[in-house]
Swiss-Prot record:
Ligand binding (ADP): 157-164
InterPro entries noted in UniProt: Kinase-pyrophosphorylase, PSRP
Annotated keywords: Kinase, Nucleotide-binding, Serine/threonine-protein kinase, Transferase
UniProt keyword Nucleotide-binding, yes or no: yes
Name of the protein in question: Putative phosphoenolpyruvate synthase regulatory protein
């Protein structure tokens, strides 16, 4: 029986990028409070690569005395069969879903290697993603306020409230062009909406955070500074949240949310539609 203090190796295996396996694996493992030693093996599309992977699985089993967990997605039946025979608990992350869809719509699936996000198969999607990322990077942390008419959304908040990681996630995963602007200490006195934002009010969205958590984050960056003090964090947050309320800017508290959750809630509250899947 697995205990909370006992660690276990976890492998994410795919004949593609393994991103899907990692994502679903993280969701599942998040419900089990044990220490996971995670390893990812992408592009396992040949007997040679599978043999190398199985060696790692066997070493894990021999070293730890318990079977590792393997979340996998493999198209070739022979590779899948060999993996299932290894000393591990193996979970095909797509099989049950694909089978259910097949049964419901009465259509045979046609799986292919590395189907997702291939540049050759969907050039427009690829370049749309790159354009969104480039725009977002160029407008990160208040670097530039030019071209706001091209923005899908403008994130506002104090420094270290989660704006940059959320912006990049929304660009990479949703294909959205995101501007993020930080309110720093110099802005707090007489805080008001920038003139550049007035005609883009419908794009404004605020991120806030509990002062205790903000202090903790800032302490990791600049320990012992006024910037990281509880009083400073409380002062900045109180003024920025007052601005959000005064200007009717919707906002959420990011304290206990992951980047994925923040991004999804922003879409939900703004009605924005993701451009890419």
């Amino acid at each position: 029986m697995q205990t909370e203090k006992q660690s276990r190796d976890v492998f994410y295996v795919s004949d593609g990028t393994a991103i899907t396996c990692e994502t679903l694996g993280h969701v599942v493992l998040g419900q089990f409070p044990f220490v996971a030693n995670e390893k990812t093996f992408p592009f396992v599309e040949s007997e040679e690569k599978l043999t190398e992977l199985i060696k790692h699985i066997e070493i894990s089993f021999q070293t730890n005395g318990i079977k590792p967990l393997v979340f996998f997605s493999l198209v070739l039946p022979d590779l899948k069969a060999r993996l299932m025979e290894s000393p591990a608990y193996c979970y095909d992350v797509l099989e049950s879903i694909v089978q259910r869809v097949k049964d419901d719509i009465q259509m045979e699936p046609t799986p292919k290697l590395q189907r997702s996000r291939s540049v050759g198969k969907d050039t427009d999607t690829y370049f749309d993603r790159i354009a969104a990322i480039e725009y977002t990077l160029a407008h990160d942390d208040g670097i530039s306020l030019k071209g706001l008419e091209l923005a899908d959304i403008i994130l506002l908040g104090v420094s270290r409230s989660g704006k940059t990681p959320t912006s990049l996630y929304m660009a990479m995963q949703f294909g959205l062009r995101v501007v993020n602007y930080p309110y720093i200490d110099d802005d707090i006195k007489g805080l008001k909406l920038l003139p550049e934002f007035e005609i883009h009010r419908h794009k404004l969205f605020g991120l806030t955070i509990d002062p205790e958590r903000l202090t903790e984050i800032r302490e990791n960056r600049l320990a012992g500074s006024d910037y990281a003090s509880t009083e400073q964090c409380q002062h900045e947050l109180a003024n920025v949240e007052a601005l959000f309320r005064r200007e009717a800017i919707p906002y959420i508290n990011t304290t206990s949310l992951s980047v994925e959750e923040i991004s999804t809630r922003v879409l939900e509250k703004t009605g924005l539609k993701r451009r890419l899947f």
